[in-house]
Amino acid sequence: MSQFTSSYDPTSFEARLYAEWEAAGHFKPSGTGQPYTILLPPPNVTGTLHMGHAFQQTLMDALVRYHRMCGDDTLWQVGTDHAGIATEMVVSRNVMLEGRGETRDSLGRDGFINKVWEWKQQSGDTIERQMRRLGVSADWSRSTFTMDPQPSAAVTEAFVRWYEEGLIYRGQRLVNWDPVLKTAISDLEVENVAEEGMLWSIRYPLSDGVTYEHIEHDAAGNEILRETRDSLIVATTRPETLLGDTAVMVHPEDRRYTALIGKTVTLPLTGRQVEVISDTCVDPTFGSGVVKVTPAHDFNDFEVGVRHQLPMIKVLDDAACILSETYAQGWMTPLNNPKGDSRWINIIDIPESEFVIPAHLAGLDRYEARKQILADLDTQGLLVAAIPHTLQVPRGDRTGQVIEPYLTAQWFVRMDRLAARGLELVERGAVRFVPPNWINTYRHWMNNIRDWCISRQLWWGHRIPAWFDEYDGSFYVGRSEAEVRAKHALGPEVTLTQDSNVLETWFSSQLWPFSTLGWPDPTAMAERGFERYLPSSVLVTGFDIIFFWVARMIMATDHFTGNVPFHDVYITGLIRDAQGQKMSKSKGNVLDPLDIIDGITLDDLVAKRTTGLMQPKLAEKIAKATRKEFPDGIAPHGADALRFTIAALATHGRDIKFDLGRAEGYKNFCNKLWNATRFVLMNTADDTAHSPAQHQAGQDGQDAPRTPQPRTDAEQWILSRLAAVTAEAHAQFAAYRFDLLAQALYEFAWNEFCDWFVELAKPALNGNDTQAAASTRHTLLYVLETLLRLLHPLIPFITEELWRQVAPRLGIQATTLMLRPYPQPQQLETAAFANAAADVEWLKIMVSALRRIRSTLNVPPSRRISLLLQGGQEVDRHRITHFAIALHFLLKLEHIDWLSAATAAPPSAIAIVGSLKLLVPLEGLIDVDAERARLDKEIKRVESEIDKSNGKLSNAVFVQNAPTAVVEQERSRLTEWTTQLNGLRERRTTL
């Protein structure tokens, strides 16, 4: 047993305890009991963990510790994700910052991959160190990296099986293309940002001298315009893609243009003729009702191109510059495939001579090309108008660049059949969402699913298991080149080259529930408990990846194993800063969990927040804001204070505003628990209440302390409250209501145990009834030991440290709290305990009322007061007599006297408890006149402040124009002033 210090210092024991737990193997599955499994969403190996990780990992660890104490066979599967794009970007930047003149490209693929592996080792170690410091009780011996041999084999197996089943195909389609990274990216990595732009109207001349009578009507159907026109006006926000137009399009029921459907227009700047087509996707009210169709550079236009069999003309290269030579493609539909299904359509080259890009535009960046094209159109009299327009601009979340819809050969997964099955599993309850409203989000995404582009033009990641014949370009899919050659009888004369692309990160992540359990290797599956631990019990994750990860795990796990990946999906909110802003490096508001746990100096915090910025110009602004917010740096709070803060903030379905002040408050809670334990230990030093012991078997085979046989009302009350909070703890764990769990345990520990029972125990401990004193000592120890077990899943370090001091006093021989059984609600004698509980609740009301009077009158704590009683019921008289010793002790009373109803009371401060009137005579206690004058003056001052605040908040200009934070601050001030005024008036009324 370690030395018990007089003050709470988490740095003195947290790291030591974790090392002891891990060395003893306490984190490993026991192999007995009901399986309880949690999958850790693997953090990316791109740096360090942030508050979002700490938030989710704290909740997961609480669940794991709770179920471990409940006797379940717990497995927390942890690991890290290779995070293809993110990691490649970070390492590429670091290579350049090393100052050796090296770049990703100069290193070459193998050299760069070696650099990434070095980074992965460094980053992975940092992540594990952070998780350990937080208290994560995971089986580290099973930690998995998504590019370890076993998961990599699973990736290859899944790809090959899906390809052989026809679910994976390779084809030309539009993808999200980042022109800086020069790779396809997922929808998740695209942020649509509302930005101000322009809407240009361009004249497309009708071919062959065709004219038409243009007629427009108002909303009532009245003709408002009739004129002959020889061109169509097309509205666009992207004139630079005009060179790739292959049609213009109108709505089939738009009377203005029905006569022109099937005619052609001459494409400006190129002289190429394109057809006027009709499609119901056109909005007749947008612009002129005529839109350009550029299938190779717009997602909607691509689908139109498929439906209408339009050529695909690519005019931008992979860097978003105008191609020097045009690259045009067209459609050829195999006879045995459904027409119009773009997944089954082959693309053929179209002779380049049919499509010409003006030479002076070749090679221009897309925005330079836009300027030049607009200038050319204006010169030719074809630019009709340019008006401001708000549009949604797709930007890559890593580079900030505008993403291009880009036509390229990629690998895809057909999602319709998989999605139908994934939706069915959730609809019938095989997978449950908590909170349940998230099923609506899941349902919407699954009903609107598209084929999944899984290939990325990167070096870091799982190479696609496909080999190309260098002679004719045909490709073969297999688990290895040797398998491909054997299966297709390819001799050494055939030169094969593996696809240089890699699979997107989510492809391997979707296999996480079962690849970590050894799939597809039968031996590994048996060793890692595939049958025992799949499905897992719960997935704790954020709502932002319900589709991109959660849905794909459901679909893949069902397809490859015939099982669901997990029973419950607990969706958390996002962690934001105290002002509700998203935490990000560019905002400079990111908090490292370790800085809250162990503290950090101001200079180190500024350096951490300003180093490695994607936009270095923000460094000065971030440094200034950091120095203002944390003038003294961040003090150490310990892991437990951070964990309890997280639990208390974990409300269902809402984003979390993280306020460091809350962590300070819960550090005080830990300190309160520490001091209460010191009190109990000091007052039970010679306790022998555990002997003779009445044994009951504990989970770990050790004896449990005997159940108290209470001799006082206070003991019966605290035991009844302990039973209630124990039952509530189990209920809140089952409901994933960590906030309500933390609140219930906090209220019991701070208010009921520390503030009340410890105080109510003192009269018994110091009284002459030795049996009551012994019983009270045992109950103090028993309740404290049970409370430490209740709190352990949330705050494991301090509870373990304190428990090791308390347990021997109860005759407990076990060496660690984390393997002790979680408390179960006790069945108490209803009538006796209920009566005692009611009596103590009455006593608490009495004491609180009289303490408020003392506080209101500013009576020093050491000053004794008199108490007069008037009225009340017979039960009140009984309770006054019964609790006389406790009342004198707790309230420092000189005497208690009863007044008859007819007796006039002296000037007194008054409180009412039911029908009982409590009077504290003022004579000799305070200078009543002076106190009245002081309160009157203070009331006027506070009323003046309230008037000022009301004046500001009733001013519409202030409310509408001041920053939101300033307005909220003023509202908060008004609330504080109002509360203060009510208190002053109450005190004045007392006098």
UniProtKB/Swiss-Prot annotation:
Q: Which residues form a coiled coil?
A: 925-988
UniProt motif 'HIGH' region: location: 43-53
Q: List the disulfide bonds.
A: none
Q: Could you tell me where this protein is found in the cell? A: Cytoplasm
Which intervals of the chain are annotated as region Disordered? Answer: 689-711
* Coarse class of the protein's main subcellular location: cytoplasm
| Pfam family of the protein (one) | Anticodon_1
**Entry's free-text remark on domains:** ValRS has two distinct active sites: one for aminoacylation and one for editing. The misactivated threonine is translocated from the active site to the editing site.
Q: Which HAMAP family match?
A: Val_tRNA_synth_type1
Q: What is this protein called?
A: Valine--tRNA ligase
The source organism is Xylella fastidiosa (strain M12)
